[in-house]
Amino acid sequence: LQIVNTSATSNVGDISFDGFYATRSKKDINAGFNIQFEDITAEKVIELMPAVDTLMPILKSFYGRLNCELAATTQLDTNMNLIIPSIKGIMRITGDDLYIKDNKMFKTLARKLLFKNKKEGYIEHMSVEGIISDSTVEIFPFIMKMDRYTMALSGIQNLDMSFRYHMSLIRSPFLFKLGVDVTGDDFENWKFKIGKPKYKNADIPVFSSVIDETKINL
């Protein structure tokens, strides 16, 4: 079964979808899809596709309108649920005029790094890309401006909810550049360490071509 060029428009955002479904037996079910959400809230993305919460758990702390793309192949169980460890694919998330709040990690880091607003962070623009494989999401480097800071971020989000992220403060009120490494078993149990920045300026590697090539090869 193959579905192509399917789209829908609603008051919660626009959705487009391409996909296929193939089965050799009840225990061997495969699917592939490219789903794109435009001008939609993070809450609705997770509601429509709960697997996104596993791929990028911090997304539920973002408020505002997002554009999201998830292209992947996966195995399905007999109830037609995604078998998370089998997912291989790419993800893209972009958005403007976003807020991150109701997030324990943000509040702790905002306090330690002397943010002006320690309750919520305003993000003028965000563009995140990553590759999903072997039960991990590799988040490629991206630039994000928040409060008085310009940050370069990258990391690994494991599908068991553990993670390892790095944040380089390439522009800040401090007289020297800092790096912050954040690791944890989940977003309730984590720790951070201040050290050297991995990225020195906003001229970070761009991996969009890798994302596009991976998407074509799915």
Regions found by a protein language model. Give the residues of each.
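Extended serine/threonine-enriched, polar tracts that run as long, contiguous segments within proteins
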Residues: I132-R148, A152-S154, N158-D160
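Membrane-proximal interfacial segments on either side of biological membranes
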Residues: L1-T6, S10-H125, I132, S154-L218
